Amino acid sequence: MLNAGRGNPNWTAATPRRAFFTLGQFAVDETQRVWCDGDLAGMPFKKGIYDRFKEYCKNNKDAGGIDLLEEVIEYGIREHGFEPDDWVFELVDAIIGDNYPVPDRMLVHIEKIVREYLIKEMGGDPKTDTHDIFAVEGGTAAMCY
């Protein structure tokens, strides 16, 4: 979602960028739900996170990009059969960004979506098993330029 908001030298795509920041707000709320001591917070908790996300969306209908963010979550569940808690947790844990240098390659769910997108854009059949996507830091920037 972050790169979807990347424009060129003189523009940005506002809705994906807002969705990215709204996901970040939800993620920080999740860390503080687990443990909060002043400016310190805990780590997101997976069990029930999808339901908490849906509740967050219901209570924050005016948050920037919330409709897109909800659709991204539902797309993964609907089109890829992702288990809802696993999918939302992966995104939340990723945006918190405290697992460096893990993972050593793309996140499990994200890799499936990126793979499908790249194969489709290159004119292939995303349903084939002939492609292995191994993107690392800087890989998306290389694709942009």
Stretches found by the model and what they are:
Residues M1-E71:
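Conserved N-terminal helix/loop that builds the PLP phosphate-binding region
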